[in-house]
Amino acid sequence: MERTFVYLKPNAVRRGLVGEIIKRFEQRGIKIVALKLFWMTREQAERLYEMHKGKNFYNELIEFVTGGPVVAMVVEAPRVIEMVRHIIGNTDPLKAGTGTIRGEFALTVTKNLIHASDSKENFEREYKIFFSENEIVDYYLDVQDDI
């Protein structure tokens, strides 16, 4: 089983899309093993997006993601990194496919509703910014028999 880190940005929370987004993951057999609602600190945001420091959109991105509550989660399924990236769509909503979360609901590249780790290495780095190991809950998901 593979895990990945996902968080819903403040505009997803403020627009009432949390349930819709989680539903799309669960309908695909993706298991949530950690979940929390909180305000991201500037320090957390800077650690998460450290690779973008110095880019023209960096400050706007940090201000945006710390400007409202977010929902962070760790999810699990076979090939979950690839599956989640497919479900959420391209970073640019105009390039995101029809039926993807960003394709249907996102407005701009910065305000694209959701972030998901793009590799196992980034998952390992990113989830540790927000979760401790004892916050990951292992349990049996009935749909696992079908995967």
UniProtKB/Swiss-Prot annotation:
NCBIfam families given in the database record: PRK00668.1
The EC number(s) this enzyme carries: 2.7.4.6
Pfam families the record matches: NDK
GO molecular function, one term: ATP binding
GO cellular component, one term: cytoplasm
PANTHER family (UniProt xref): NUCLEOSIDE DIPHOSPHATE KINASE (PTHR11349)
Record key words, sorted: ATP-binding, Cytoplasm, Kinase, Magnesium, Metal-binding, Nucleotide metabolism, Nucleotide-binding, Phosphoprotein, Transferase
Binding of ATP, residues: K9, F57, R85, T91, R102, N112
Cofactor(s) the record lists: Mg(2+)
Protein localization: Cytoplasm
Official protein name in the record: Nucleoside diphosphate kinase
Gene3D superfamilies membership: Nucleoside diphosphate kinase-like domain
Lineage: superkingdom: Bacteria
Catalytic activity: a 2'-deoxyribonucleoside 5'-diphosphate + ATP = a 2'-deoxyribonucleoside 5'-triphosphate + ADP; a ribonucleoside 5'-diphosphate + ATP = a ribonucleoside 5'-triphosphate + ADP
UniProt cross-references to HAMAP family, sorted A to Z: NDP_kinase
Family membership: Belongs to the NDK family.
Primary localisation category: cytoplasm
Native source species: Thermosipho melanesiensis (strain DSM 12029 / CIP 104789 / BI429)
SMART domains linked to this entry: NDK
Subunit annotation: Homotetramer.
An example Gene Ontology biological process: UTP biosynthetic process
Chain's role: Major role in the synthesis of nucleoside triphosphates other than ATP. The ATP gamma phosphate is transferred to the NDP beta phosphate via a ping-pong mechanism, using a phosphorylated active-site intermediate.
Catalytic residues (positions): H115
Gene this chain is encoded by: ndk
